[in-house]
Amino acid sequence: PFICKLDSEDQVTESENWELANPMFHQPLSEYAESLLETIFEEYEDLEDDPSNREEFMTKRMNLPVTDLERSVASYEEIMDTNRPLPNLEGRQAIGCLDFASLRDFAACGLLFKDKDDYVFKTHSFVRKQFADIYYGYSRKASEQTKERFAPIKEWENRGLLSVVDGATIEPQTVVDWFVEQRYKYGITKIVADNFRMDVLRPLLIAAGFEVVVIKNPRAVDSLLAPRIETAFANRHIIFGENPLMRWYTNNVLVKTNNDGNKTYLKKEEVRRKTDGFKAFVCGMYLADELTDYNFEDAFDILEELDF
């Protein structure tokens, strides 16, 4: 497909070049083009005071994705390269993981597998309908959508990547039920999560027969796992499959490095740019060394063939 964009990042400093990414800026300008150009000028000037929005500006306004690797988990290309077909995972050992920091917006569940040198992540999210309506225009009709880019919650729902929950909160039992359902297909050995909401979730998971591991110091784990995660992205050893929601989560992560070089995974924007799926992935990576490239169903088939 033909994409109008800047040829290089440094072209953004000359507003005359913006026409490359926005053909409507070719003279004479329409009334709408004049209004949009003024808006983009204001956004560009704001970058002087707050450069943290530069990645979003370059992607949204100049159609040129750029990545500040001092602030992001991986480059745009590395994140996009997670879009590879999932191998056959049925019967394989998996680490269950979840992020359930808030009952009122998002929750993410996941299963981490090892396939040779690759980390394969299968995930599902739950989103509260009222939150999706307010911040992403979930219930709007297509004719009512504004030009501002929202996360396409309804599209992701239709693709089975998430479920929208119409209630006052996301019920903890909903999360537990997802893992119970997955247990029929995969060998879930443990479920790991940080300590947020685990006072509620842990008894429910244990009652369902799962072994639960709680990460009590998530920031220390971020720092511990950052080199492994960054290396896995760089070497294309992470597979999310056809899952734009998971890539959205990952792209929303802000990497904060302290004076000692320790890294913490935060959000680039607190409200709309969610990271729940990525945080669940980090929890899974905490126990990744326990994973084996092993198929339980194959082992059971061999046992059935033995004559005792």
Residue ranges of each PLM-predicted region?
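Beta-sheet entry/capping signal
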Residues: P1-I3, Q11, R92-G96, F106-A108, ...
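Non-catalytic, compositionally simple segments
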Residues: P1-I95, R104-F106, H124-V127, F131-D166
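Metal-dependent DNA phosphodiester-chemistry modules and their immediately adjacent helices/loops
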Residues: P1-P23, I206-Y294, L306
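Flexible loop/turn segments at secondary-structure boundaries
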Residues: E9-T13, D68-R71, S102-A107, D117-Y119, ...
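Flexible, glycine/threonine-enriched loop-and-boundary segments that flank and lead into catalytic domains
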Residues: L69-C97, E181-G187, V192-A193, V200, ...
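Acidic, metal-ligating active-site segments
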Residues: L103-D117, G277-K279, C283-G284
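Mg2+-dependent endonuclease catalytic cores in nucleic-acid-processing enzymes, primarily RNase H-like
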Residues: K129-D260
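Acidic, low-complexity intrinsically disordered tails
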Residues: E297-F308
